[in-house]
């Protein structure tokens, strides 16, 4: 995502002069650019893996077809549901977060700097941003699994027990707002635009890639790791792996699951203990 962040900053970012004004031109151009990006990444990956079956079921976590004619999904179809939520809500919220931060920076309300002004801090921020994103996600994701928020918001995302690229951003609009709100950090600390795009693309394109349903994409001898077995188990079992695999949250909460029978037994024990405490 860092390379893509540099690409967007260098060639696809609106000028600060434009961003200082909330004019329809650059706002629409930003929305269209983000739509193109997600269509290339999520749409292209979906076509390769599921329409053209470019690598069959090799390295696929779950070989079942995506559900159709299921009332739980919009249009009674998982893929159409996922595309609609990703595009109509996900990309709009992503674009809003980007445009808001750029406008605040362009009007001097928050601070930015050139790469040459603070090269050490630029590199430090690049190293820290993935950790910030993982910890922020782990915290808000665990909150989304509280009963009130899960039933009303997060259950939309968990309709997808068997995920594909379009499932990554298929969620309730409220969850989109929460997901992209980790950019609030940039309201507090000076940043370079690359940092903004690194954070946004971590979700906007990273979520589709981590939900491919495959461990890796293969093109002849080339193998590109994209899947996330840790999170795949979360979609299947729900009550485990709330954080990213790098996050200490699940180890701290006792909810880490590595797919082994021993982890299954621990989860069953935890469920029994929870049921006993609820009934008592």
Task: Give the predicted meaning of each segment.
Residues 1-139, 143, 152, 160-181, ...:
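Non-catalytic, topology-defining segments of multipass membrane proteins
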Residues 10-13, 158-159, 203-204, 220-222:
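N-terminal start-of-chain detector that recognizes signal peptides
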Residues 136-163, 210, 214, 226-239:
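Acidic (Asp/Glu-rich) catalytic motifs at the cytosolic membrane interface
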Residues 189-247, 252:
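Functionally important transmembrane alpha-helices
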